[in-house]
């Protein structure tokens, strides 16, 4: 098996090394990841300048681009054909609305766009101590997916509590929860007195009840959320069609 590993925390992040080492027991692992932290990069792709790649002493490839750049580069000619893409282990949660901004999830999505099964895996906690737990779970999921293919346009978004493996209460298939709107921006001033702005903290949980990814984590379970790349809202078709029929367009 040939496995591509990427992330958004950067090629030197602890999570990616632990993940790659664990997956190496299943086959050949190639690591292609950003040269620095690119958290929040979402699905951005670099189109206005070339990408530069550096191979590190440990064999990993460092790219001066986004997580999506890394996977796109790897799967469209930079590497030999690959069987599966695993993105992570992210240092922090990717729950609910987080997936809209997550470079970790985006790297997995790019793998799926390019025809491969893909998993995004994140650790939930403030000072991550148990990356090995997520790495072992990722390995088991890769084994399962090698024999049981996911439907097209589907990835798995996996969140793991920062706990020793023997304290994990199980795995739950979940839906995305939601957060309230983000907190206001934070305004500060640079040494020259000019205003600068920081994006505010994410909003608190709004929908975090049973069945959500938030709830699974709170109860000590691994959350596994199947995400679909087709974002069409099919249930709205009839209502929207009726609404549009009321609009008169004249030349």
UniProtKB/Swiss-Prot annotation:
It is found in: Cytoplasm. Keywords: Cytoplasm, Hydrolase, Metal-binding, Nucleotide-binding. Binds 1 divalent metal cation per subunit. GO terms for cellular component: cytoplasm. Its cofactor is a divalent metal cation. Its EC number is 3.1.3.5. Its main location: cytoplasm. It catalyses: a ribonucleoside 5'-phosphate + H2O = a ribonucleoside + phosphate. Signal peptide: none annotated. SUPFAM superfamilies: SurE-like. The keyword 4Fe-4S does not apply. GO terms for molecular function: 3'-nucleotidase activity; 5'-nucleotidase activity; exopolyphosphatase activity; metal ion binding; nucleotide binding. A divalent metal cation binds at residues 8-9, 39, 90. It comes from the Bacteria. Pfam families: SurE. PANTHER family: 5'-NUCLEOTIDASE SURE (PTHR30457), 5'_3'-NUCLEOTIDASE SURE (PTHR30457:SF12). Belongs to the SurE nucleotidase family. Nucleotidase that shows phosphatase activity on nucleoside 5'-monophosphates. This is 5'-nucleotidase SurE. The gene is surE.
């Amino acid at each position: 098996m040939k496995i591509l590993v990427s992330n958004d925390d950067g090629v030197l992040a602890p999570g990616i090394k632990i993940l790659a080492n664990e997956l190496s027991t299943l086959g050949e692992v190639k690591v292609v990841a950003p040269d620095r932290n690119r958290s929040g990069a979402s699905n951005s792709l670099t189109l206005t300048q070339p990408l530069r790649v550096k191979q590190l002493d440990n064999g990993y490839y460092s790219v001066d681009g986004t997580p999506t750049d890394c996977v796109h580069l790897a799967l469209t000619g930079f590497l030999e054909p690959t069987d599966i893409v695993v993105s992570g282990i992210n240092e922090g949660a990717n729950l609910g609305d987080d997936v809209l901004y997550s470079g970790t999830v985006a790297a997995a999505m790019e793998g799926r766009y390019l025809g491969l099964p893909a998993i995004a895996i994140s650790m939930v906690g403030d000072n991550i101590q148990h990356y090995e737990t997520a790495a072992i779970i990722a390995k088991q999921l890769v084994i399962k997916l090698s024999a049981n293919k996911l439907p097209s346009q589907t990835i798995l978004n996996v969140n793991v509590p920062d706990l020793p493996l023997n304290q994990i209460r199980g795995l739950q298939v979940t839906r995305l929860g939601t957060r309230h709107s983000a907190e206001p921006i934070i305004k500060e001033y640079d040494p020259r007195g000019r205003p600068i702005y920081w994006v505010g903290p994410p909003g608190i949980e709004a929908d975090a009840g049973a069945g959500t990814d938030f709830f699974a984590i709170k109860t000590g379970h691994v959350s596994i959320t199947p995400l679909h790349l087709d974002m069409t809202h099919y249930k709205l078709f009839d209502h929207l069609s009726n609404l549009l029929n009321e609009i008169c367009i004249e030349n």
